[in-house]
A protein has these predicted regions:
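Glycine-rich phosphate/adenosyl-contacting loop at the front of the ribokinase-like
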Residues: 1-58, 63-67, 74, 92, ...
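Structural alpha-helical scaffold elements that stabilize or flank donor/cofactor-binding regions
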Residues: 125-126, 173-174, 213
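A glycine-rich helix N-cap at a beta->alpha junction
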Residues: 71-86
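Conserved phosphate-binding/catalytic region of the ribokinase-like
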Residues: 3, 194, 198-278
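Conserved beta-alpha-beta core of the PfkB/ribokinase-like small-molecule kinase fold
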Residues: 132-204, 227-229
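Conserved phosphate-binding/catalytic loop of the ribokinase/pfkB sugar-kinase fold
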Residues: 84, 94-132, 137
Length: 278
């Protein structure tokens, strides 16, 4: 069944200025509405390298919900376990500046509780033959528990990402059961109740190694934008992965693509976490 991706679907509404962006002022621009959501993005990214993932999630019982399913199927994602329910999709509204960076965003989360029943009814079918599991950690606690239970039952590795660290912080006890957790520098600061925004990669690497060891988290990767990424394992192994220079057009989904690549590498390729992060 390949990699199973579990999480929420969002509709992204994005605004781009036509001239110099004025914070707090009126800006003429253009608007885009696209399918989004961390896990949906991850499933599509994995499918784009021909790995045929399975997406487990919810969509609205509407034409927009069917559009999401149709697009995933066009990318060869297995959509058998997507359930149509009222309020099945969230909304993410973001404003971008002239550099392609998000200057402000607000999101409305969907009701993901129907996933609990879906996993209870079809969990064995979903997880028994999968290669690994990519999990959005800020789902309902019961959904995370169910996923980890099935992973243990069938001996599957679980890799986790977040879309809202404020919610995911309430799930931090589960991180000891996650084979690799990926987040950005700001999210890592929230997780460990500290401010890491000023840290350079060398210092971030040392701090992360200490935190991962003390919290007994098996493996963690922290992305740092243009500074690259750092990783650490509970056994003391850690390192820095320099960034590759690219022309930025839109940073939306960059972290999702990084996570998808990490999951693909850890699932399909027998190389170490440094080479995977590259």
């Amino acid at each position: 069944m390949g990699i199973v991706v579990i999480g929420a679907v969002f509709v992204d509404i994005k605004g781009y200025p036509l001239s110099t962006y004025i914070p707090g002022g009126r800006n003429a621009g253009r608007m885009e509405q696209v399918h989004g959501g961390v896990s949906r993005n991850v499933a599509e990214d994995i499918a784009n390298v021909e790995l045929r993932p399975t997406f487990v999630g919810l969509v609205d019982d509407s034409g927009m919900g069917q559009d999401v399913i149709d697009k995933l199927e066009n990318h060869k994602v297995n959509t058998r376990f997507i359930k149509k329910v009222p309020d099945g999709m969230g909304t993410w509204l973001a404003i971008f500046d002239n550099r392609g960076d998000v200057t402000a965003a607000i999101s409305k989360r969907p009701d993901t509780t129907p996933l609990i029943g879906l996993l209870a009814e079809q969990g064995d079918e979903i997880f028994a033959d999968c290669d690994s599991i990519a999990l959005e950690l800020d789902l309902e606690k019961e959904t995370v528990k169910q996923t980890l239970k099935y992973a243990k039952k069938y001996g599957k590795k679980v890799y986790a990402v977040v879309s809202n660290m404020s919610i995911a912080m309430e799930r931090r006890d589960f991180l000891q059961q996650i084979d690799c957790f990926v987040c950005n520098q700001q999210e890592a600061g929230l997780l460990f109740s500290d401010d890491y925004d000023h840290l350079e990669p060398e210092e971030m690497c040392r701090v992360l190694a200490g935190n991962v060891h003390s919290a007994n988290i098996p493996c963690m990767v922290v992305t740092m934008g243009g500074k690259g990424a750092v990783f650490a394992r509970a056994n003391g192994e850690c390192g820095i992965v320099p960034a590759k220079k690219v022309d930025v057009i839109d940073t939306t989904g960059a972290g999702d693509a990084f996570f998808a690549g990490t999951v693909i590498g850890l699932t399909s390729i027998d190389i170490d976490i440094y080479d995977i992060s590259k």
